[in-house]
């Protein structure tokens, strides 16, 4: 989810409140970053602490490395972690944008990356590397980014890579219910069991890997 500290429309508190009303238990706010705006991570952490200390929802601070040169992705992931990001995504080679070739490969090779978001026509080699490095792949609810969901679901399932279903929320209308998220997983070709894994078990594994308690 993205706040107004990158290209989202809402403050972290309003994102959390709207998610809470939809019965979400845990969300991550992962604003778009490159070397120019890493300070956005620290800006949201105090607000996230306020939310976690007072509301019945868990908010995880994170970052989504976006449109950066592939050569600096691992460096940016390390810096983001030091600044307080507990979960690191990379903005993958979606069919909807001219993401630089090599981004997917750099992301799955990095031990500091947790999720490769909307990876488009990700290759077999890249998926195998993702499995070896414990990098999850995203099934996206977002228009445009969702175009390769079927490909991602199929190749990830064949190789045994964990999948995550994400909204890529930028505005209030992007937030969805658990039932809607299940349908997106099924629409991508996942079985009911695999869709549930992508919505419940796999996110918990990532949170545990990041040391987040919930």
Where are the regions a protein language model picked out?
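Histidine-centered catalytic micro-motifs
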Residues: 1-6, 29-32, 119
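Acidic/histidine-rich helix-loop elements
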Residues: 2-8, 36, 71
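Extended substrate/RNA-proximal surfaces in nucleic-acid metabolism proteins
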Residues: 38-139, 207-214
């Amino acid at each position: 989810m993205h706040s107004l500290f990158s290209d989202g429309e809402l403050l972290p508190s309003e994102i959390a409140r709207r998610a809470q009303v939809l019965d979400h238990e845990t969300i991550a706010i992962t604003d778009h970053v490159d070397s120019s705006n890493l300070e956005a991570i620290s800006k949201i952490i105090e607000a996230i602490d306020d939310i976690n200390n007072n509301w019945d929802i868990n908010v995880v601070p994170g970052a989504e490395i976006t449109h950066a040169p592939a050569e600096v992705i691992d460096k940016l992931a390390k810096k983001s972690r030091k600044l307080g990001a507990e979960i690191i995504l990379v903005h993958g080679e979606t069919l909807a944008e001219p993401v630089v070739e090599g981004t997917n490969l750099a992301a799955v090779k990095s031990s500091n990356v947790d999720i490769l978001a909307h990876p488009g026509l990700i290759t077999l080699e890249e998926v195998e590397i993702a499995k070896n490095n414990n990098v999850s792949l995203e099934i996206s609810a977002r228009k445009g980014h969702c175009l390769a969901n079927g490909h991602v679901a199929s190749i990830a399932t064949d190789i045994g890579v964990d999948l995550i279903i994400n909204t890529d929320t930028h505005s209030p209308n992007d937030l969805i219910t658990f039932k809607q998220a299940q349908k997106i997983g099924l629409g991508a070709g996942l079985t009911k069991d695999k869709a549930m894994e992508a919505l419940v078990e796999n996110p918990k594994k990532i949170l545990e890997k990041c040391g987040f308690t919930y």
